[in-house]
């Protein structure tokens, strides 16, 4: 049975993909797995989730412990292109080293966005728990602002209010201000998809349920369990449902100069 499943897994990991993905999310989940010396340690599994031109979600690929470099990510996205993908409009990621350059070497027009949830996590490491709620509300005033001007003002407020006591937290946002500013090049509904990671978080929380206990013998055992989870529970949960608020997002993608022609080609 296992061998049959592994054949299915291999086929699934190399299956043809859609020609366009409006949004792609890259995130990672850690699993305990034996290394080449038989020692159990942590390995990163990168999960790539796509939302197609019609708002449907699918996991495009799983990649175990890739070296975080431009050439590795270039190979990964080259293999995604070889499976039929012609264009990716937006890609959201945690600041994975080399990913942005790797994507752009294959899909030069893709807009790469730092995931806001990860920026919040990285900045709140510096904030004591009693202030978390207030700090997060001030962060939301920035990335959830109605326009760039309000976002810039909210950042100044954040800096004035928290900068003296918690400079580490402010530094995280300061270093990524270009990603906050970039959000405001797009209408509100597209912005929301770009900065929220609900889609990939739900995939990862489902996968975490099967990685909690024990460890994996090898990469194949990881792929097998993840494949069964993705094509079983997650496929049932998604049940061909479109991404929330998709009609509005599609309208905005169809009106934007930089995406209208690119998406029109692929809508039935």
Where are these regions (language model features)?
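Conserved beta-strand -> loop -> alpha-helix junction used to position metal-binding or nucleic-acid-contacting
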Residues: 1, 90-97, 102-138
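Conserved, well-folded catalytic cores of nucleic-acid-processing
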Residues: 4-8, 12-15, 32, 51, ...
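Residue-level signal for pocket-adjacent positions within structured domains
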Residues: 58, 102, 118, 122, ...
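Acidic/histidine-rich catalytic cores and adjacent linkers
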Residues: 141-268
